[in-house]
Amino acid sequence: MNFQQLKIIREAARQDYNLTEVANMLFTSQSGVSRHIRELEDELGIEIFVRRGKRLLGMTEPGKALLVIAERILNEASNVRRLADLFTNDTSGVLTIATTHTQARYSLPEVIKAFRELFPEVRLELIQGTPQEIATLLQNGEADIGIASERLSNDPQLVAFPWFRWHHSLLVPHDHPLTQISPLTLESIAKWPLITYRQGITGRSRIDDAFARKGLLADIVLSAQDSDVIKTYVALGLGIGLVAEQSSGEQEEENLIRLDTRHLFDANTVWLGLKRGQLQRNYVWRFLELCNAGLSVEDIKRQVMESSEEEIDYQI
């Protein structure tokens, strides 16, 4: 048994048992992946995967138990590799933050400025992606902190802390008829072409749910990943825009006006996520503390390092 075999078991579960994708993620060949699986099954005397011909469909009960143990072993191995750095490089290094465009552009600048004053020798890397991509980066150890409004709070491999709550607001031209309606209604908004975020990011599900509850179908003519793109097309007259309220900026003041829609759409929460059980340098804990003053470094450490491992029934 070796680490590569355990990595293959873990990656197979992550890639929905597609061995081609497993091989790509681990920079090896598909034949090599298959060989490692066969050798591990022969060594343990069990079948790890449910098969149909050569295709993997899922995990057997022993395979599921093995996956829990493999996750634990690989996580602890990662912690061992981090250990020396934790004690020798406490105030310098690289902090990698995976986040959405909206948070990187509008929510993080002041926090990053304060962080740099505390840790001037720490370099920062911002990776922008979708909530799903952010969660994957955290799970794979490719990011230290993940920040998003969706997904991070319900992933068992991650620990998530609330940062702040926000609502959507409506962007329209200054002379738009909706500026004369108070309070705004979903029915009045649904009459106009709408530009907003694409599925799966920046509270899009809250928008869809609000219209669905009223039995309305919004005319979404364009969906985008970031607020600045939405603003651009609203300014061009393609439609009205639903954007995060924190995405305000000077560039919109000349042509656009924001209308309050807090009474129409449910609030969203921005979450700060870390990989559960993973050791971190002190500056990682401090960054989270800067974001959420209600959490102490000790509280954050305790929750991240607490075990939530599945109980394994060894009487399979």
Swiss-Prot record:
Example GO molecular function: transcription cis-regulatory region binding
Top-rank lineage group of the source organism: Bacteria
UniProt cross-references to Gene3D superfamilies, sorted A to Z: Periplasmic binding protein-like II (3.40.190.10), Winged helix-like DNA-binding domain superfamily/Winged helix DNA-binding domain (1.10.10.10)
Native source organism of the sequence: Escherichia coli (strain K12)
Xref: SUPFAM superfamilies: Periplasmic binding protein-like II (SSF53850), Winged helix' DNA-binding domain (SSF46785)
Signal peptide: none
The family this protein is said to belong to: Belongs to the LysR transcriptional regulatory family.
Database matches in PANTHER family: HTH-TYPE TRANSCRIPTIONAL REGULATOR (PTHR30126), HTH-TYPE TRANSCRIPTIONAL REGULATOR CYSB-RELATED (PTHR30126:SF6)
Protein name as catalogued: HTH-type transcriptional regulator cbl
The HTH lysR-type domain, residue ranges: 1-59
Pfam families referenced in this protein's UniProt entry, alphabetically: HTH_1 (PF00126), LysR_substrate (PF03466)
Function: May be an accessory regulatory protein within the cys regulon.
UniProtKB keywords: DNA-binding, Transcription, Transcription regulation
Gene Ontology terms describing biological process: cysteine biosynthetic process; positive regulation of sulfur utilization; regulation of DNA-templated transcription
DNA-binding region(s) in UniProt: 19-38
InterPro entries: Cbl_PBP2, LysR_subst-bd, Tscrpt_reg_HTH_LysR, WH-like_DNA-bd_sf, WH_DNA-bd_sf
